[in-house]
C-alpha cells in the first residue's frame, strides 16, 4: 500500500524505504523486494484500499485489524466470520481505535552515542521516546526511537542527514492500557488473533491483552 500512496521510488517514499530496509534486515532477497514493488504498482493492484476493522475478542479485549483489500465485501465477511467463530464481535468505526496510539518506530546502532544527548537532538525532530535495547539476534547494542505516526517522514530525513543508518523502522498501534487475563482466557483470545492473521487481506493485528 505504501507504493500506491507515494510512488515506487524509495528516495521520495519514506514508507517504502522502510519496507525495503526491513526486508533486507530479514535477509529477504533483493529480487523478492523488487517483485513486491512491481506487483504493488501493477494495474491489478490499482483498486486496493486500506481498511481498518475494530472489534472485541472474548473477555473484552480490544482488537484493531489493518487490511489491504480490492474487495471490501469479501474482507468484511471474512473478518466478521473470524470474530463470530471465536466468540468475538466486530464493532463500528471508532469503537476501539481511540484506545490505541498510532506510532512510528526506528532502530539504529548505538555505537558511541550518548543516549541523553542524542535524545535531546531528536526531540527537535518529533521523537517522543528514546531508549537503549540489546538486539540479541544481531548481538548489537541499539537505540529505539518512538514518535507519532505523522512524524515518520521527518525523522527518516533527519537520521539520513546525520548519516545514521536505520536498521529497521515501522508502525505500531500501541494500547494505552493493557488488560490481564488468565491462561485459559488468553488462549481463547489467541485463537481469534491467529485466525485473523491467517487471512490474506490482513496486514497487521493489534490488541490490548497484556502479555
Positions of PLM-derived features:
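Intrinsically disordered, Lys/Arg-rich N-terminal extensions and targeting peptides
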Residues: 1-11
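Ordered, soluble secondary-structure elements with a strong preference for glycine-centered loop motifs
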Residues: 10-14, 24-31, 69-77, 112-116, ...
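Translation machinery proteins
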Residues: 10-67
Amino acid at each position: 500500500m505504501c507504493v500506491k500512496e507515494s510512488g515506487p521510488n524509495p528516495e521520495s517514499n519514506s514508507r517504502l524505504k522502510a519496507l525495503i530496509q526491513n526486508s533486507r534486515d530479514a535477509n529477504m532477497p533483493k529480487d523478492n523486494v523488487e517483485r513486491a514493488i512491481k506487483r504493488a504498482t501493477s494495474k491489478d493492484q490499482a483498486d486496493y484500499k486500506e481498511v481498518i476493522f475494530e472489534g472485541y475478542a472474548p473477555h473484552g479485549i480490544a482488537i484493531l485489524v489493518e487490511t489491504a483489500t480490492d474487495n471490501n465485501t469479501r474482507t468484511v465477511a471474512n473478518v466478521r466470520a473470524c470474530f463470530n467463530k471465536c466468540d468475538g464481535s466486530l464493532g463500528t468505526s471508532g469503537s476501539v481505535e481511540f484506545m490505541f496510539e498510532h506510532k512510528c518506530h526506528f532502530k539504529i546502532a548505538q555505537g558511541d552515542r550518548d543516549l541523553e544527548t542524542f535524545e535531546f537532538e531528536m526531540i527537535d525532530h518529533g521523537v517522543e521516546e528514546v531508549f537503549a535495547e540489546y538486539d540479541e539476534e544481531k548481538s548489537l547494542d541499539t537505540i529505539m526511537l518512538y514518535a507519532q505516526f505523522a512524524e515518520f517522514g521527518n525523522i527518516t530525513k533527519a537520521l539520513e542527514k546525520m548519516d545514521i543508518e536505520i536498521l529497521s523502522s515501522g508502525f505500531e498501534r500501541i494500547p494505552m492500557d493493557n488488560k490481564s487475563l488468565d491462561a485459559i482466557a488468553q488462549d481463547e483470545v489467541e485463537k481469534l488473533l491467529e485466525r485473523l492473521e491467517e487471512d490474506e487481506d490482513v496486514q497487521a493485528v493489534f490488541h490490548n491483552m497484556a502479555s
